Amino acid sequence: TAPGELLPYNWEAYSASSTPFKIGSFDCTTGKTVYWGREDVKDNSDFTTRCQASSSIPIAMPMVQLDGTAYLDGAIGETGGFAVDAARADGYERFLVVMTRPRGYRKGPVKAPAAIYQKIFKKYPAVVEAILRRPERYNATLDELEQLQAEGKAYLYYPETMPVSNGERNAVRIQAAYEEGMQQARRDLPAIKEFLAG
C-alpha cells in the first residue's frame, strides 16, 4: 500500500474466524468506556468505524460518531487505556499486557491548563474530566498490573526500546521500530508461552 492509501482489511478472514475480541472506546457523553465484540460488528465499514473510534486521540483526531454517539480513544477511560476491566468481565484472571512505554514509566500531570480542554470540549464535560484524570487512572492501573505481575497473574511485555511516538509519520522509522519489536518478540516468546501455559 502506498503512503496515504488505506491498507485493505481482510474481511473474509475476519468473517471466517470465531476468535473473540474487544474494541474499547470512550463514550464522550457518559464518560464510560464501551467495549464492542464480534457480535456488535455488522460489516467491514462498521468494523473500521469502531476501530477509528477506539483510536481517535483527543484534539489530534476528530471524535467518531457511531449511532448518534461521539467516541474518542479508549485510553482516556476509567483504566487509563488498559483493558483489564474488559478481560475480567469476560472471566479472565491472568493477563498478558503489551506495553508501549519502558519499564518504570509513569504519566506526569497534564501540562495544558484545564481551560483549554474546557473550551475545546465544552459540550462534553466527561471528556475534559477524563483527559485531566488520565495520568492518575493510567498510573493506578499500572500499579495494579505490576502487583499482579509480582503475584504471577500478569506478564507485562515491555519494549526494550521505543524509538517512535504515537504521532510518528516517517515510514522508514516506523518500519525500523517494527523490526526491533519483532526481534524482541522472537527472543521473549519462550517466556511468554511459559506464562500463558501456567
Segments predicted by a language model, with ranges:
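Patatin-like phospholipase
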Residues: 1-198
